[in-house]
Amino acid sequence: ETLPEPARTGWFDYDHFYSDHVFEEELPILRRETSFRSVCDVGGNTGKFALAAASFDPEVKVTIADLPEQCAAAKEKIAAAGLSKRIALNPCDILKSSPADLPQGIDVWWMSQFLDCFNNDQAVRILRLVRGAMEDGAVLAVNEIFGDRQKRDTAALVVDECSLYFTAIANGVSRFFNSGEFMECLAAAGFRVRSVRDGLGLGHTLIIAEKA
């Protein structure tokens, strides 16, 4: 949110173009997997998924856990949508947080293209943090793009080239995972994969996992 214009608008228009096409497909899948009534969007960014989840089911309560500046930006959009009573904000630095810093009583812990902003050790640390906050019966739902799970070679090449862009331009760490590498991170953090669905949106994969 601290990007200067026109970079800020350009980046979020690009990012939202992909995410906006996948949330409407993934929420019904989540509903079939679990009768959730609460969701925590870890790394909720501008609140796009939180707004989609709240609109999907009027009984669902959503919490965004992200940096204070991201929560402040999301707050404006949430208020504009008239959903301030159903979408809560949990400002925190995930890398410096403990399970006690995260909301309680959450059914679905959601991460959308969030862990690919970190190196493997950091991703495992974040996953362990969330696992520590999860109650029995809760699930982890991860929306990611994997080059090795694309249906066509051209799509895989596009994902891999975008990954190189993120590493070189963003922060030197961001990149898209290889799916096998990501599964290893989940296992290292104490998760067992329940289901994997490819080909959602414009090439996303939805992984639903639970505590091992």
Where are these regions (language model features)?
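Conserved Class I S-adenosyl-L-methionine-dependent methyltransferase catalytic core
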Residues: 1-37
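Alpha-helical subdomain
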Residues: 33, 38-212
